[in-house]
Amino acid sequence: KLKKEINNLSKATHREITKSRQHFLILHLPSTYRDIMNMGITDDYTMGYAMEIGFRASTSRSFLFYDLEMEYTTALRVHPFAVMEGTLRDYQQMNVEQALIAYKNIIDEVKAVNGTYISLWHTESVSDKNRWVGWRELYEKMIDYALS
């Protein structure tokens, strides 16, 4: 099924699909990574927490996935993310102002180690509708802060 979805997306976009993020951040290691590598995926952006801020792999830098069962370094590059907007709003019950402080804190931590800052945002959260009013502006402020 996933291979078919990758092929359909590739046809629709006229691009080779090489990047992935698993829905709900569900990873079954090592099988998820083995499966997506077999389908031509070279980069994955699933490595992060749903309910917490921080790095699930203890690093802010991308790395090649090491398959412990097979005892070898694969060609799959894992890109850990620092925080998901839903973590702050839904799990940690932060408002926009509190979330901006949290984003700035993690950005500062990543900058201090010369790491790569990646955050996960969903299209709904930048719509500025319903429960996400104010989060689009927060997104823009977060980007500005990360780039400063």
Regions found by a protein language model. Give the residues of each.
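C-terminal domain-boundary segment and adjacent tail
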Residues: S10-A12, E97-S148
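Glycine-rich phosphate-binding "P-loop"
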Residues: K1
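Active-site-adjacent pocket scaffolds in enzyme catalytic domains
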Residues: N7-V110
